[in-house]
Amino acid sequence: MARAKFERTKPHVNIGTIGHVDHGKTTLTAAITMTLAALGQAVAKGYDQIDNAPEEKARGITINTAHVEYETANRHYAHVDCPGHADYVKNMITGAAQMDGAILVVAATDGPMPQTREHILLAKQVGVPKLVVFLNKEDMMEDAELLELVELELRELLTEYEFDGDDIPIVRGSGLQALEVMTKNPKTQRGENPWVDKIYELMDAVDSYIPDPERDIDKPFLMAVEDVFSITGRGTVATGRIERGKVKVGDVVELVGIRDTRNTTVTGIEMFKKSLDEGMAGDNAGVLLRGIQKADIERGMVLAKPGSITPHTQFEGEVYVLTEKEGGRKTPFFAGYRPQFYVRTTDVTGTIKAFTSDEGETVEMVMPGDRIKVTVELINPIAIEQGMRFAIREGGRTIGAGVVSKIVK
């Protein structure tokens, strides 16, 4: 059966839910889809459908990143439900990288927690421009003054990480109450239930506060490979978010990073299981490649316009080292330290050759909480460029975040 074409009539925006584990991100995501489904602007998804990878069921924690799509009157949204648990920050980093804005979910009963702080920091580091806050579990809060205090604390925290804490919309509500109302009566409209109205209020805030993304559509094509699979009789598909530019069926693209750079031709493009003639910046797409075996391509490579990006092993970067409070190290580290550098979609081991202060002096020891310039050498060449964000990780946890300031080699 030929696949339906994907219609582009409204601006497309990638958003997602971030925040501390068990604060209600997945419940809110389900509530949004069910609320908008009443208007025919979404496919209703229950909590279990969003929390649907086997590992997630086993632990009751969202591990993988779930994608849902919905529309408001003004926009089409692709929404990722990011993992909340510190063990799975790896996916938070790939997930948050796919956001033009995010909904920070904070349980009013707890207020900001360590992962709330970490997710705000990560959102900053991966370049999420704007956040909207959903203050969840309002139904469990008797004390209005306490709600005000939680809100104040959140605004201060957001300002600390250079978001506009004074202006950020904070919408109060209960994802669970809205979800229960919509489950009982899936046709509930705006104005018929106060909890459902809060979901509309949140989407209004997202529509107005999160800007239409400035698409990098005129830059040369680049897509970081997140996953690879084979389609029998058709070839190998690489999936990921198109970071910039456009790609058309028939285009020649380069496969860059980890191994020797090679050319291939695009034979098909799909998005949300529908065929496209071209994919463009911001799309989460599957790209079918001619003459490439599944074994030739892996997560961490990029597809790019030939000659537009090159693989490198050495760079300088500005790094912020997380404090213990933010989930970072307790102890300092020294030149020669070998962590993993999380670049776009993958971890690459590298050595920090040197630390340099803002004054240009060599620094021997770096403490949690420091901001420092690093010189890094990676064991594998990766497609890197100035301004690119990365995370520094060890033993499965993020201990630092940075941005490439200069390519050395």
Curated annotation (Swiss-Prot):
Subcellular location as annotated: Cytoplasm
Segments carrying the region annotation (G2) are 60-64
- GO cellular component term, pick one: cytosol
**What Pfam families does the record tag this protein with?**
GTP_EFTU, GTP_EFTU_D2, GTP_EFTU_D3
Which branch of life, at top level?
Bacteria
Q: Which reaction equations make up its catalytic activity?
A: GTP + H2O = GDP + phosphate + H(+)
Disulphide-bonded residues: none
Q: Where is the tr-type G domain?
A: 10-214
Positions of region (G1): 19-26
| Sorted UniProt keywords | Cytoplasm, Elongation factor, GTP-binding, Hydrolase, Magnesium, Metal-binding, Nucleotide-binding, Protein biosynthesis
| EC numbers | 3.6.5.3
Could you tell me one molecular function GO term of this UniProt entry? translation elongation factor activity
Which residue ranges are recorded for the region named G3? 81-84
> Which intervals of the chain are annotated as region G5?
174-176
Binding residues for Mg(2+), per the UniProt record? Answer: T26
Cite the binding residues for GTP. Answer: 19-26, 81-85, 136-139
Q: Where is this region: G4?
A: 136-139
Q: What is its main location?
A: cytoplasm
Q: What does this protein do?
A: GTP hydrolase that promotes the GTP-dependent binding of aminoacyl-tRNA to the A-site of ribosomes during protein biosynthesis.
Can you state the subunit structure given in the record? Monomer.
Family membership: Belongs to the TRAFAC class translation factor GTPase superfamily. Classic translation factor GTPase family. EF-Tu/EF-1A subfamily.
- What HAMAP family does this protein's entry cite? EF_Tu_B
**Protein known as:** Elongation factor Tu
Q: Which organism is it from?
A: Nostoc sp. (strain PCC 7120 / SAG 25.82 / UTEX 2576)
